A protein has these predicted regions:
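Non-catalytic interaction-recognition regions
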Residues: 1-256
């Protein structure tokens, strides 16, 4: 049923109308509709109807289901009326970050920006690392950790890389990826960086953003090992090449 007895469109009709609306606003290459897993059968009907009405739009529309978010402490429950909204969760995470950086003497505007950036990264990482179709178990403490698998850890690694680049810029040093130092042994970090294009392409083709999360976490881990074992700004003949590795790391993490 697409039109009820009162002549009003049902949800099915609205979804099909939305598909036409998207096409009218600007022809798209692919439209991905993400809903809760409970909507899977409902969208089978929608997609079947759309394929009959407008096959071209249906061919480039994909429906993906995802699980629901649950908290590790089990405190969220719709029956108890304490469901947390996305904005509410971000605000809560930002408040926790604010407490952690309260002694850093940031200006108010700067502190607010940092709080928001870290909160968003924490939530995005926690959501995107989970394969579609499965429930997301959200642990606030792990999500805000600067160690291990978390958004803030990725941010910390990128800030560390950019700090090295800023120091190099102040000294008027230039990254040189074209001159491989004599006797240089390829580092694990370099091998990871080479995989960036294929990782992004595979994630796109498979609609699997969790692959990018896994990859960027590995890059961050390898970079921190590289940073701990190598003195980048050492005045040696390999300095320019090592700087190029740091710059490439910064670019890759930023674009993930």
């Amino acid at each position: 049923v697409f039109i009820n007895s009162l002549g009003l469109p049902t949800y099915d009709a609205k979804e099909i109308g939305l598909a036409f609306r998207k096409e009218k606003l600007g022809s798209f290459d692919k439209s991905i509709v993400i809903t809760a897993s409970e909507q899977q059968e409902y969208f089978k009907v929608v997609m079947a109807a759309l394929s009959k009405i407008e096959p071209k739009i249906a061919a480039k529309t994909q429906h993906i289901t995802h699980g629901m978010m649950q908290f590790a402490d089990g405190k969220m429950s719709s029956r108890k009326g304490n469901v947390v909204s996305g904005d509410g969760l971000l605000a809560e995470l930002a408040d926790v970050v604010g407490e952690k950086i309260a002694d850093r003497n940031f200006e108010i505007a700067e502190a607010d920006e940092i709080k928001t950036m870290i909160a968003v990264a924490a939530l995005k990482y926690a959501v995107l690392k989970q394969s579609p179709g499965k429930n997301i178990i959200f642990d606030r403490d792990k999500a805000l950790s600067f160690e291990g698998d978390s958004g803030p850890y990725i941010q910390y690694s990128c800030v560390r890389a950019k700090s090295v680049l800023e120091k190099a810029h102040d000294r008027k040093l230039i990254p040189n990826p074209h001159k491989l130092p004599d006797g240089w042994a390829t580092r694990p970090l370099e091998k990871m960086l080479y995989r960036f294009p294929e990782t992004i392409e595979k994630a796109m083709n498979e609609v699997a953003p969790q692959n990018i999360v896994t990859y960027v976490t590995q890059v961050a881990s390898e970079f921190n090992s590289f940073y701990g074992n190598e003195q980048v700004l050492d005045g040696s003949k390999s300095e320019g090449y090592k700087l190029a590795i740091v710059r490439a790391t910064s670019i890759v993490i930023t674009n993930c």
